[in-house]
Curated annotation (Swiss-Prot):
InterPro entries: Ribosomal_bL32, Ribosomal_bL32_bact, Ribosomal_zn-bd. Residues 1-16 have a biased composition (Basic residues). It comes from Psychromonas ingrahamii (strain DSM 17664 / CCUG 51855 / 37). Residues 1-45 are annotated as: Disordered. GO terms for molecular function: structural constituent of ribosome. GO terms for biological process: translation. This is Large ribosomal subunit protein bL32.
């Protein structure tokens, strides 16, 4: 089993963790038909995608 020779400093730990932060929330788009805000590449809550009704709710 691997065991480190010496303890990592707070600085090195922070540098390693600097890439772990979550990015901004998903991008949003506005539907052309209803003007409703929705996640990109997803249908709106009322069933429209790219201006067409894709599912009956």
């Amino acid at each position: 089993m691997a065991v480190q020779k010496s303890r990592k400093t707070r600085s090195k730990r922070g540098m390693r963790r600097s890439h772990d932060a979550l990015t901004a929330p998903a991008q949003l788009s506005v539907d052309a038909t209803s003007g409703e805000t929705h996640r990109r590449h997803h249908m709106t809550a009322d069933g429209f995608y790219r201006g067409k009704k894709v599912i009956e709710l």
